[in-house]
Amino acid sequence: MVKQMPGNRVVLISLLQLRKSTLYPGPDSFPEYTGYGGCMEEPKLIKVVGAAIIKDGKVLCAQRGAGKSLAGYWEFPGGKIEAGETPQQALQREIEEELLCEIDIDKKVCTSDYLYDFGNVQLTTFLCHLIEGMPRLTEHECIEWVEPSQMPRLRWAPVDHDAVTRNSGMAF
């Protein structure tokens, strides 16, 4: 550390001298960090799945409804993985429940994590195709078929950003 002294003299102060000063009392003066379970609790891990459903070169995007966390944000439809389910089973179930249609799961796009104030959401997004029915609103505020290049213009839930980036550059 360099300290300017009267008369324009420069004095080097060693880190050891600084540590001994009252400005920095040293690590012994602070409570010991014990990691998760000590000072902080480990965030709840919430595993969810999302479907990037493709039809006629467009991707189905869903806007979260009022009264839900992240209301007004866009997402790929899907939901939580229940105990004993594979991600694919959870996605099939969630799409049937939320959109009243059936999908064929093609391939995994990506898995991403985002730490929200309510927990750590781990989203696995799959590329999917409609096989029966047309998506209908049951839980979302709005659903839209969007050109992949236009997807970044929507206000997406943070955990969906990686999948949006990967899908927006694709041609279906």
For the regions a protein language model found, what residue spans apply to each?
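Conserved Nudix-box catalytic region and its N-terminal flanking loop in Nudix hydrolases
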Residues: 58-97
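Short, Lys/Arg-enriched N-terminal segments with co-localized hydrophobic residues
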Residues: 28-39
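Conserved N-terminal beta-strand and adjoining loop/helix that marks the start
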Residues: 41-59, 80
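NUDIX/MutT-family hydrolases
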Residues: 127, 136-167
